[in-house]
């Protein structure tokens, strides 16, 4: 996508790649993050690219709890840590 870049990525225990995108800094000043053109994705060889969350301002931290039933994703523009139910078998998150 034009104007965005990958900012943060992590791999789960099953080898699935999760990553967030954000506006490319070359697009202007910090206020451009309000455009929320970033997204949060999962990538696997079998399923390809799957968008999990849209309208991300500033993609940051990705983590799971100890038993892999919760996933955490940070949108620093919102100063928010999102918590999702996480299915380790499928890689799906609650919406």
Feature names for model-found ranges:
Residues 2-17, 23-24, 34, 39, ...:
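Beta-rich, blade/repeat-based domains predominating
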Residues 14, 45-46, 67-68, 76-78, ...:
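Short strand-connecting beta-turns/loops that link adjacent beta-strands
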Residues 19, 27-28, 81:
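Glycine/Thr-rich phosphate-binding loops of Rossmann-like dinucleotide-binding domains
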Residues 22-24, 76, 86:
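Short loop/turn segments immediately following the C-termini of beta-strands
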Residues 31-32, 38-41, 80-82:
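A short loop-to-beta-strand structural motif that recurs across blades of beta-propeller domains
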Residues 42-44, 92-93:
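Phosphate/pyrophosphate-binding betaalpha-module
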Residues 50-54, 93-95:
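Beta-propeller fold detector
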Residues 84-93:
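Short loop/turn segments immediately following beta-strands, especially the blade-tip
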């Amino acid at each position: 996508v034009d104007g965005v870049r990958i900012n943060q990525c992590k791999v789960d225990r099953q080898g699935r790649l999760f990553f967030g995108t954000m506006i490319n800094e070359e697009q202007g000043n910090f206020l451009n993050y309000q455009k929320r053109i970033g997204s949060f994705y999962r990538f696997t060889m079998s399923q390809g690219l799957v968008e999990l969350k849209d309208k991300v301002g500033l993609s940051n931290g990705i983590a799971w709890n100890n038993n892999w039933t919760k996933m955490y994703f940070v949108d620093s523009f919102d100063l928010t840590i999102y918590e999702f139910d996480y299915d380790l078998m499928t890689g799906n998150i609650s919406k």
